[in-house]
Amino acid sequence: MRQLLFPVAALFLNACTTTPVPPVDPQQAWVDFTTPTPGSKLVMAQRLDGKNLDDGRFFQFPPGHHELMVRFDFEVPAGGGLGGLSQMMYRTCFMTLEYDHFRAGQHYVLEGRSLAFTPNIRLYDSARQLLAEERSVNCL
């Protein structure tokens, strides 16, 4: 039984990593994610206008006002050891951002950053202009 478990698990993991991202719809706004902070693990779409999403790799939606909720996982010092910084643990935060002027065909980037225990997200347009920052942060 154990010998069968590993190949089946590998098959499911492979399916998750090879699912293609759908093509960009020019009639909608598109938001990708990035995290330049060392120790940042994940920025993922969680909700759009209060509704859970099926695919957390991106946001794609009609133009106008929208509220985006993202999940952001990043490393923080866990204490212990010399100076209390030898062990790390992951912190998970859910952050909400609102923006009124999403435009059709425009590509946006949502950037997750952390400074120690303090996370933030910023929304940029394709010219790297800052458009919005998070309005609420809830961490576990």
Report each predicted region and the residues it spans:
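Sec-dependent bacterial lipoprotein signal peptides
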Residues: 1-16
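Short loop/turn and low-complexity linker motifs enriched in small/turn-promoting residues
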Residues: 16-140
